From Swiss-Prot:
Organism, scientific name: Bacillus mycoides (strain KBAB4)
Family: Belongs to the universal ribosomal protein uS9 family.
Gene (UniProt): rpsI
Protein name: Small ribosomal subunit protein uS9
PROSITE patterns tied to this protein: RIBOSOMAL_S9 (PS00360)
Keyword terms, alphabetized: Ribonucleoprotein, Ribosomal protein
InterPro entries for the chain: Ribosomal_Su5_D2-typ_SF (IPR020568), Ribosomal_uS9 (IPR000754), Ribosomal_uS9_bac/plastid (IPR023035), Ribosomal_uS9_CS (IPR020574), Ribsml_uS5_D2-typ_fold_subgr (IPR014721)
CC terms in the record's Gene Ontology section: cytosolic small ribosomal subunit
Cystine pairs: none
Pfam families (alphabetical): Ribosomal_S9
Length: 130
């Protein structure tokens, strides 16, 4: 018998996460590794768990994630977005809960580009009066 799976794609900064929710005991596997080993910071691990905690489904699904691009923060945000979208497909009644928690909104903030004549995006070279 084919197992029920729910898919969701999440994005944040330059990271893209393809998330698969499978009914199970609550394990989170990111790129073939356990998420405690993949994400070194406890705060970012909490970010990844936010949608499951908000919908009270923490032990109900195994989360299988393929994520690439960006750093730890971007990847954690992308995974959170992907899990939220997959949960929405699993049960549309979660929409209000996830929306109120702000978990369905794609965080549009990106790194600002460096401009010519400047040291960074906005940092100007040191000014010398004489």
């Amino acid at each position: 018998m084919a197992q029920v799976q729910y898919y969701g794609t999440g994005r944040r900064k330059s990271s893209v996460a393809r998330v698969r929710l499978v009914p199970g005991e609550g394990r989170v596997i990111i790129n073939g590794r356990d998420f405690e080993n993949y994400i070194p910071f406890a705060a970012l691990r909490e970010v990844v768990k936010q949608p499951l905690v908000a919908t009270e489904t923490l032990g109900n699904y195994n989360v299988l994630v393929n994520v690439n691009g960006g750093g730890y923060t971007g990847q954690a945000g992308a995974i959170r977005h992907g899990i939220s979208r997959a949960l929405l497909k699993a049960d549309p009644e979660y929409r209000l809960t996830l929306k109120r928690a702000g978990l369905l909104t794609r965080d549009a903030r990106m790194k600002e580009r460096k401009k010519y004549g400047l040291k960074g995006a906005r940092r100007a070279p040191q000014f010398s009066k004489r």
